[in-house]
Amino acid sequence: PSPSPVIIKEVGDNSSSVERYSHLYTELYNISRDTRRSTVTVTGISEDIDWFNNTYENKGQTTGLIVANNGIEQLILTDYETIRDAQSIKVTYFNDLTVEALVKGTDSNTGLAVIAVKNYMLPSVLLDEKLIAKLGSSRSSSLLGIPVIAIGRPLGNIDSIEYGMITSKGNMLNLVDNNYELMTTDLHGNKDSTG
């Protein structure tokens, strides 16, 4: 007797699976696009002198996240290293407006700083409450596998985006003044990454 033919039943067609996959990434991009309005480019500027005794500007750039507005100034969380030795700090918004900022506080243990832009320097569109980033909580025990989106400069370029997921939680970082619970992701970065 000849063997019975193998019948393969297709569950859903491939094009709809590809379309669903593409739609998922479109939705992730839309979330990142909307969230990027809460990010700014922070430029730390300092003057240096070259070997020929000529003065030149040295600029470092990173991403900042609008985290609050106290009614007097807008507060932005950013990378401390980029502004550490800066003689002036500039903040550039999504609409290309660039204004001066001042350092409010720094934490060398975490590598973070808070800078401030005076409200009177900003048009009303940049004072909108919707620009303040909505921060989540890491207290949940079921964070493993949750999708994450890195915005800012995760690949070292301004306005780059990277997608991944939380891969571990629970490792502790013990520093002088505090203990921090670390979460890791499968996002990769490079030495120029911030965001």
Give the location of each predicted region.
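C-terminal recognition in membrane/secretory proteostasis and scaffolding
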Residues: 1-4, 80, 194
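Conserved active-site neighborhood of the chymotrypsin/trypsin-like protease fold
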Residues: 68-152, 156-159, 187, 191
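Short beta-turn/strand-loop junction motif enriched in small, turn-promoting residues
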Residues: 45-49, 151-155, 171-172
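Short beta-strand segments
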Residues: 58-62, 97-99, 123, 162, ...
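Short beta-strand-centered aromatic/proline hotspots
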Residues: 102, 162-168
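N-terminal activation segment of mature serine protease catalytic domains
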Residues: 2-66, 75-76, 88, 143, ...
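Gly/Ser-enriched beta-turn/beta-hairpin loop segments
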Residues: 50-59, 105-110, 116-121, 169-183
